[in-house]
Amino acid sequence: MTQTSENVTWLTQEAYNKLKEELEYLTGPARTEISAKIAAAREEGDLRENGGYHAAKEEQGKQELRVRQLTQLLESAKVGEAPAADGVVAPGMVVTIAFDGDEDDTLTFLLASREYASSDIETYSPQSPLGSGVLGHKVGDDAQYELPNGKPASVRILKAEPYNG
């Protein structure tokens, strides 16, 4: 999944289905469970000193935030196939870069939004400084981006392949 222009998020059908399942769980069984926790904690008495109540309310807030995020994401999603394997850096691709052209100092990452993040590969969003710097470049190109401290940085695109995870 990747954010593209105009806040449209590109998703594979599999990713879309996974996020939709999560939303259905959060708006169904998870809401029922947290409501039951809050009700049980409320019955314990004084709410000002009721740690279980406050923990359940905090959990409820996190769940509702995730519901809003997923709803917005799925409403703006464009479901389609993975990007073409044409060597052009695009959302949904695994990119390998060399910092300052030094092929011994490389980084491989998935160019996608955080919902696509997994533990097996580092993920950078297309809106991040590095992501926006490499977006649209081809294998072999040198790309520039701005570091958080304002200094320019240069990378060479070594590989750009569709993500298959």
UniProtKB/Swiss-Prot annotation:
Gene Ontology biological-process annotations: DNA-templated transcription elongation; regulation of DNA-templated transcription elongation
Function recorded in the entry: Necessary for efficient RNA polymerase transcription elongation past template-encoded arresting sites. The arresting sites in DNA have the property of trapping a certain fraction of elongating RNA polymerases that pass through, resulting in locked ternary complexes. Cleavage of the nascent transcript by cleavage factors such as GreA or GreB allows the resumption of elongation from the new 3'terminus. GreA releases sequences of 2 to 3 nucleotides.
One Pfam family matching this protein: GreA_GreB_N
Protein name: Transcription elongation factor GreA
Coiled coil in keyword set: yes
Residue stretches in coiled coil: 55-78
Gene transcribed to yield this protein: greA
Cited InterPro entries: GreA/GreB_C_sf (IPR036953), TF_GreA/GreB_CS (IPR018151), Tscrpt_elong_fac_GreA (IPR006359), Tscrpt_elong_fac_GreA/B (IPR028624), Tscrpt_elong_fac_GreA/B_C (IPR001437), Tscrpt_elong_fac_GreA/B_fam (IPR023459), Tscrpt_elong_fac_GreA/B_N (IPR022691), Tscrpt_elong_fac_GreA/B_N_sf (IPR036805)
Highest taxon of the lineage: Bacteria
Gene3D superfamilies (UniProt xref): Transcription elongation factor, GreA/GreB, C-terminal domain, Transcription elongation factor, GreA/GreB, N-terminal domain
S-S bonds: none
Species per Swiss-Prot/TrEMBL record: Streptomyces coelicolor (strain ATCC BAA-471 / A3(2) / M145)
GO molecular function, one term: DNA binding
Keyword vocabulary terms for this entry: Coiled coil, DNA-binding, Transcription, Transcription regulation
UniProt similarity note: Belongs to the GreA/GreB family.
Keyword DNA-binding: yes
SUPFAM superfamilies in UniProt: FKBP-like, GreA transcript cleavage protein, N-terminal domain
